[in-house]
Every structure is written in structure tokens, then in C-alpha cells.
Amino acid sequence: TLPCEKSKNYLTEWKDDDPEAFLKDSSVEMQIMFIGGGNAYVLFRRGEECQNVNKFLAEYILNRTYSLSLAVAVVKKTENYSEDYNAINEEMRRIKASMPLSMPMGAMPFMAVDSVTGYPLTEKTREEYLCTEAKLKREAFPETEDEKIFDNMVTEKGDSSTLAVFHIDGNSMGKKIKDKMQKIHTYGDAVRTMRALSIDISDTFLETVDETKKYIDSIAPRVKKDTSHKLYREIIAAGDDIT
């Protein structure tokens, strides 16, 4: 946590702050331009600060997921946003293609392992032993939502107990963004436009999810006797990525 006098130089509330603050005020050390499509685009005044933040993020993600890793691309800022945007995305493609696969430490021959992941068992609940990844996933799922028990979600146990997994990804979002941004070259205009576009995409998809859930809840009494349990479990609803 930064001291109050320094926090004003690190701008993270990208939906609310001045999109040109970093460009106009040299005391601003860092500013999030926008977050969208699973990526965060950030301006840093100094390379050392960029390195420190990325180290913190990598450790934070590892501690809270155990099995995910952070991919980071860095390019030098110019005055042409369009060229910089293309350059950093090209660098990210290169990084992802060449970065080593980061995996948690596996089990030694004398260790008990998780039957699903193969990772060492590290935790014990009242009912079972868990690996670190399984423990973190369970902690992330609210205890009040019993849709984690699949039998509670089906309409009937037996022949009609099949569950479906739906994954929706806005595959045309990249083209939409590219078409929108290809004629914008200044950072001020580009950041403002990208922020509005990212918020619009996120709001539209979340609104669609909410409407879908309302519809499913409305028809639940017609297809299931016990309506105390939902017919669905929302796993991910972030931007244009829904599961």
C-alpha cells in the first residue's frame, strides 16, 4: 500500500480518472490506460517502476491461483499511439510463443497426490485432502452457493441429469477494436476511445448475462420441481468472456 502523498502519482481507477493525466503531468509515475479482453495496458514513467509492479503482480497471481502465470510485454512509448499499440501486441505474441511453461512444483515419489491435478496434497479438510490449487479454488467459490453440488442443478437424477458447459467469447471484438482505432494516432484520443469501448463491451455482455439468468429463473418452475437450487452456475463473466 502506497503512502497517501504518493498514491496520487499512481492512477489505477481508469474508468474515472483523467485519460491524459500521465501525458500532462510528469509527476504521475503510472497510469492504467484501460483494461479489456483479459489485458491491462499501463503507462510507466520509469522502467524500474514497471519491473517492480510486474514482480508484485506475478507473485500475487501465483499466491492466489497457484497454477497461473503472468505474461508481460514492454515497449518504449512514442508519440504515435497506433504504432505503439501494434508494437506491444506484436511483442506480447512473441512473449507468449517463447515464454517457458510455468508449472508448480510436482510431487516427489513419496508424496500423496491429487487424483485430478497430480499436484501434492497439502491441505486437509474435515472430509478430504486437497492440493493447493483445489484449496484456493474452493475458497474462491462462495459457500452459500450450493450449485457446486452438480446433483442440485439437474432437473432429474438419472437419464435426464446431463449438464452442459457454455463458453461464450466475443471473437469479433478484436476486429471491432482494430477498425475503431486504426485512424486514431494521438494518445489522448486513443485512450479516451478505448476506455469507452472497453466499458461498452463489458456492460453489454454483463447485461446479456443478467437477462439470460432472469429468463432461466423464470422458466425454472416449468422444468424442475425443486426451485430452491438454480439451473445454472456462473463461473466467469468478465468482459467478452463468459462461462
Q: What residue ranges belong to the model's regions?
A:
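Regulatory and interdomain segments flanking nucleotide-handling catalytic cores
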Residues: 1-243
